Regions:
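A residue-level marker of the well-folded mature domains of exported/periplasmic proteins
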Residues: 4-325
Length: 325
């Protein structure tokens, strides 16, 4: 583990696909980064790239050569490269989000996205089945749009489907991938097709592309479900809820540990429902539109997940279930 004072070594946050301004994953992590810098007096900056996936090794090696003492990497596809690079720079500390990588100077941060997504799928299905709610078909038909076909994104989607089918075993969940995290126009087009095809609620797991999903929900008079941050206010009344993933807390905590020379090298930090690392938003603009019984049912499911009575499938650890192959 690298030992350095704040004055000696600055820190960097490597921004993932979709970039800053996505009003989602990257922006929330960056908010935590800025807060952590202010609280610790560390010096640091975000690192962006036009092709963050293809340039993984170049990005990580340049940042390491530049003298950063800590690199926090938000890009899922960088995992293997980061583990390799970390071996060549033993005096630099590295953090990778959303997967486990080994190394004395590597810390891994995992989120139990499947748990929050389970609750999102359950709520979406309960609401879609209720024709008394404006815009809902009365049928258990919902959708989800992922930013890319990867196990990291499918972790959300599998949990969402499991939650939907916990409410109604015959629930239909339309699944599509935008193959892009920064194009709202694609998100709007794909979500419109889902709404036109009968979906009443569409969950976006596509970063900035998902902003188009929210726009499509507003245009169709349906519901979107936001992700990572509380996106309910982006289209008040048309974002049913958001599956919040507290990347801000994770990044801020790592910075504090680093500043205190307590960097968790070689360790994995896991944040799920139990740690308030994931969960649904307060539904500020929609709670009064949804029957209290539906909200209570979702809350009961949350308690059962916390108690272990409901076990949510983790696609990263368990592979894919039969219903998603």
């Amino acid at each position: 583990m690298a030992v350095a004072t704040a004055a000696e070594k600055p820190v960097a946050l490597i921004i993932s696909q979709g970039g800053l301004g996505d009003q989602s994953y990257n922006d929330l992590a960056y908010a935590g980064f800025k807060k952590g810098l202010a609280e610790t007096k560390l010096v640091g900056k975000p690192v962006e790239s036009k092709d963050v996936v293809a340039q993984a090794a170049d990005i990580l090696r340049r940042a390491s050569d530049a003298g950063f003492g800590l690199l926090i990497d938000l890009e899922y596809s960088h995992g293997d490269t980061l583990q390799t690079v970390a071996k060549d720079y033993p005096d630099t500390d590295y953090v990778i989000l959303n997967q486990i990588k080994s190394g004395k100077n590597v810390a891994s941060v995992l989120f139990q996205e499947q748990e929050g997504s389970f609750l999102a799928g359950a709520l979406a299905t309960l609401v879609a089945k209720d024709a008394s709610i404006k815009g809902m078909s009365g049928k258990p038909v919902i959708g989800v749009i992922g930013g890319t076909k990867s196990v990291g994104i499918d972790k959300f989607i599998v949990g969402y489907i499991q939650g939907a089918r916990a409410v109604d075993p015959k629930a239909e969940v339309k699944v599509a991938y935008s193959n892009n995290f920064g194009d709202p126009a694609i998100g709007l087009q794909m979500a419109k097709a889902m709404f036109d095809g009968g979906a009443s609620v569409v969950y976006q797991v596509a970063g900035g592309t998902g902003l188009g999903v929210i726009q499509a929900a507003k245009q169709a008079g349906k519901f979107a479900i936001g992700v990572d941050t509380d996106q309910d206010g982006l289209a008040p009344g048309f974002v049913l809820t958001s599956m919040i993933k507290r990347t801000d807390v994770a990044v801020e905590t790592v910075l504090k540990d680093y500043a205190d020379n307590k960097f968790p090298g070689g360790q994995t930090v896991t944040l799920g429902l139990k740690q308030d690392g994931v969960g649904l938003s307060p539904m500020t603009y929609t709670k009064d539109k949804i029957p209290a019984a539906d909200i209570a049912e979702v809350e009961d499911m949350k308690k059962k997940i916390l108690s272990g009575e409901i076990k949510v499938w983790n696609a990263v650890d368990q592979g894919y279930p039969d219903y998603f192959k």
